[in-house]
Amino acid sequence: MAPPRNVVKIAVQMRDAIPQLIQLDQAKPLAAVLKEVCDAWSLPHSERYALQFADGHRRYITENNRMEIKNGSILCLSTAPDREAERLLRGLQSESREGRREALRHLLLLAPDLTFAREVISRDGLQRLGTIIEDGDDLGEVLALALRAFLELMEHGVVSWETLSIPFVRKVVCYVNMNLMDASVQPLALGLLENVTLSSPTLGQLVKSEVPLDRLLVHLQVMNQQLQTKAMALLTALLQGATPAERKHMLDYLWQRNLRQFIYKNIIHSAAPLGDEMAHHLYVLQALMLGLLEPRMRTPLDPYSQEQREQLQALRQAAFEPEGESVGAGLSADRRRSLCAREFRKLGFSNSNPAQDLERVPPGLLALDNMLYFSRQAPSAYSRFVLENSSREDKHECPFARSSIQLTVLLCDLLHVGEPCSETAQDFSPMFFGQDQSFHELFCVSIQLLNKTWKEMRATQEDFDKVMQVVREQLARTLALKPSSLELFRTKVNALTYGEVLRLRQTERLHQEGTLAPPILELREKLKPELMGLIRQQRLLRLCEGTLFHKISSRRRQDKLWFCCLSPNHKVLQYGDVEEGVGPPTPESLPEQLPVADIRALLTGKDCPHVREKGSGKQNKDVCELAFSVSYDHGEEEAYLNFIAPSKREMG
């Protein structure tokens, strides 16, 4: 006769004892189960003991998670979490260095378990770890273990980072600023300061004032990937917490110290593969760099500004008055105004008063900046563009100013200028670190591409929007290739001619039409059962191979990874935390299990609980597109296993 549904057959182990094979009644209180297990081994005081999962992080069994125990689970009897917390915290005060080290190692092993973490925190465990960190008696392994345990306990969110004391933060800053320091300590100290900076504006200002940018540059230039990554993480956190003016000042200083060149040569083009966390921080740095353009993009031209009027005149003169010659010399004021208005029209402005064209935001003054940069950095190309088009028939001239204004809007859109940083994105473009003034340089390439495409399309003024659509496609396709330099971008985008764009469009259209043709649809319907079987096999195979996922908190992107896969018999989802840089784990080594039979539903996008918790906003859009959750039975409640897919391709 089969056992009742709420009874599971499990094994319970204890050191130096013969394991027990028992039938666990999930309806029975856990205290009663513990007493029965202890009685079988003649152990008094069952309240001093607890059950743990025998593998992985050895999580404690509680009334909240006991439904995760399944048939065949192996548990072990161990000291209750409150008593274990007390024992280890006493060990931290040992006069023996080895005793403190062993206590810290064991504490670190159990710290990921929330039940144990709460017991430690309630007994002032964070303060005791803080004392070890502040005293700094041992700058080697003991300090590294204390920092790691402190970070693990704080990760549970039971205590806010804002509660940390100023002396404690200053001491951690000292470890970052010290020259001779154990290699395992500084990445942990940097990681702790990153958390502080992102979570507390007040303490973030303290970190900003006491960690010199030069010190972070030193850490970035050490050939140690972990140290580089944590230094970059703190740098981007400091930049994100700064005001726009402070951010500009900081980035200007970093660029003067050749950080851009170092990133390009020694991080992006390093022989070692770029880690996901570093890729994310480079994306954030790129977004912050481009974000400096936002004030100009949001500011319309002021017709009463003498400086801006002079800039417009400089733009006109560079095209029509070479080498400082004044064409309007000797003319009356009215004739001179009429001549200037005509030349501004030839320059491609829609209005005789160009200030009216630049009142639109975006792109505001950023479009004027781009045009001036092009006229000064590529004067020959600029004058050739303007003079060629101003001498063509009216219908076929490519309006430089109108094109520049629209192209600036297009580039800002493609590069997400002014949008909040994503929490998950890693899609930085290497060429932005390979070039000074990268946005303006990209504009110079793009405006010449636009002129070339205009000619290839034999466009007229009525075709302006069509030309812009083609240029958008040319730029988007080339940017998606992530060229490593501006020169490579120039080569690739110029090779993508209007004819090539048409060919690609036609190929894609024919592919779509072909797949929807009646004979194809009929054949597909006939083969559907076989195809569905193959698709099912392929998907099961992919699920069995497993995938690495990033852990995402409501505050920031985490550097922790976890792995999930389907068991070979397709009955259980197996998952657990893994270290970055380590190969995919074997299913047997993963500590957590979720029976497929317990799964209720698959949720995606806004229906996922971890997306609902994060709220709305632009920064949440990409998370929403990549989010999915598995809901499952957890006792009488519904629980969730939450995922953020690595990419849209994986999500598909």
UniProtKB/Swiss-Prot annotation:
Function: Involved in cytoskeletal rearrangements required for phagocytosis of apoptotic cells and cell motility. Acts in association with DOCK1 and CRK. Was initially proposed to be required in complex with DOCK1 to activate Rac Rho small GTPases. May enhance the guanine nucleotide exchange factor (GEF) activity of DOCK1.
Ranges for domain ELMO: 307-479
Pfam families assigned to the protein according to its UniProt record, in alphabetical order: ELMO_ARM (PF11841), ELMO_CED12 (PF04727), PH_12 (PF16457)
Listed GO MF terms: SH3 domain binding
A GO cellular-component term linked to this record: cytoplasm
UniProt-listed InterPro entries: ARM-like, ARM-type_fold, ELMO_ARM, ELMO_dom, ELMO_domain-containing, PH-like_dom_sf, PH_domain
Protein name: Engulfment and cell motility protein 3
Keyword Cytoplasm applies: yes
Xref: PROSITE patterns: ELMO
Gene3D superfamilies linked to this entry: 6.10.250.810, Leucine-rich Repeat Variant (1.25.10.10), Pleckstrin-homology domain (PH domain)/Phosphotyrosine-binding domain (PTB) (2.30.29.30)
Xref: PANTHER family: ENGULFMENT AND CELL MOTILITY (PTHR12771), ENGULFMENT AND CELL MOTILITY PROTEIN 3 (PTHR12771:SF16)
BP terms from Gene Ontology: actin filament organization; apoptotic process; cell motility; phagocytosis
Subcellular location: Cytoplasm
Keywords annotated in UniProt: Apoptosis, Cytoplasm, Phagocytosis, SH3-binding
Subunit structure, interactors included: Probably interacts directly with the SH3-domain of DOCK1 via its SH3-binding site. Part of a complex with DOCK1 and RAC1. Interacts with ADGRB3.
